[in-house]
Amino acid sequence: MQIAPRLPCKSGAVSITTPRVFDFNLLLTNIFGRNSKSVPRRSAKPVDRHTITVCRPAGGTVDRRLLMNATLPAHLLAMERRAVPAEMIAALKIRFAERCSTAQAVREQHGRDESPFEVAPPDAVVFAESTEEVAEVLVLADRYAVPVIAFGVGSSLEGHLLAVQGGISIDVSRMNRVLRINDEDLTVTVQPGVTRNQLNNEIRHTGLFFPIDPGADASLGGMAATRASGTNAVRYGTMRENVLALQVVTATGEVIRTGTRAKKSSAGYDLTRLMVGSEGTLGIITEVTVKLYPQPESVSAAICHFPSIDAAVKTTIQIIQLGVPIARCELLDANAVRAVNLHDKLSLREAPMLLMEFHGSAASVAEQAQVVQDVAREHGGENFEWATTPEERTRLWTARHRAYFAGMSSHPGCRTVTTDTCVPISRLAECIDLAVREADEAGLPYYIVGHVGDGNFHIAYLIDPAKPEQRETAERLNEQLVHHALKLEGTCTGEHGIGLHKQGFLIDETGLATVQMMRVLKRALDPKNILNPGKIFAL
């Protein structure tokens, strides 16, 4: 998207070149606000790529950094920052003392995540240490109609943490206690700032583990809020299947509980599932109860190289269709392997590779491994290498989890535009083939990693921030890939969430009527639109 100022409009104008089909009225609503009488209207018929000039009504301010970094029409939402009254900041400082900061460095730290967007930071940061303190901040925010954004470790890839309307960032990283381990029931309750590595370290003595492992050492609160998954999802599922209950602070500061530790319930609406994946727009999660699993008797990992990405993907599809209960099945293309070798000082063969792991009894693991080897050989797989010791497995999986940063370090100074499509397993080969051909034709550097066992893969396009044409190319490729995935009955995001980046795709995937229903829920639970405004969709 190209945005530049125009002169004829007294209150300031913005020229926007759109790179995709979109609803003209929805875009204008996002820019002017729903109640502006000066907004020109036209039919809701979608319009194709063109340039329009719109005038911002007097009395509002536009965050130019958001405009200049926007890449899709939907990102022009929530550009007007809300004023945070001085008396609210003063009240927070009196209540939280040094745990309420307006220092520029602290605000900047909480105004960035791993997404490529740059917007102004929040007006203040509060380091909360309890559910009651989160509720106190929200009571004040409700009184003054000030936005609030929850912050865990800052690993979002989709702009979830960005204060697009200003406001207060609530840092919950100090809420990092494991509250209750119920090993007989295979559950644990934690505060939102507990990270996955911390949790597994603290419960290791029980013989149990928590399997969900996104690439970053993310917080459990953030993982629940984005409905995250990871390399183990093919066997253990995602956060959607593994969260049993939540404690949530609402927009008015009320504390509610959803769900129980029981394995099933038919009691009323399933508010737990509503909150899981809501990206902090319906409430702030302050406790999470999740399932645990017995540590497997035997674990073995292997890598296998293939002559092509297509051969690796077809191997994966056959493994899943045969019902092999594989625990992990990860794809790295040659570019990703090369980057990992450089970053982690490994010497893996630089060819498309599957990295797999098997859990179970010794006999079961041996049987699974034999079936997988036979299938891989049918598709040209070779050089099966086994990692049987914990140290060898840890080294391989650490390298896999670092692939994102390894890819970036291979092109110093670059940023990434990362895809997150997920398709039915039977359509995976077709989707990846289309993506690879289009990426090769475009000429941008890229690498591919994927949780291909459940149909989810990521292409990271590496771009020079100083070259807007590269950003535009990457977004065009991302858009094309999403549309391919949707035609194949897949989704625009398997695990990263919508955030700022994928809002236009949400309408493409679900339809406008479905998004309107989501808006109805949002307005009912957050009538002042103070909970992480501007994410998922515009109001």
Indicate residue ranges for each PLM-predicted region:
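Intrinsically disordered, low-complexity segments enriched in small polar residues
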Residues: 11-15, 33
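Intrinsic-disorder-associated, low-complexity terminal segments enriched in Asp/Asn/His/Tyr and depleted
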Residues: 23-25, 30, 35, 48-50, ...
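Activity-critical C-terminal alpha-helical subdomain
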Residues: 254, 503-539
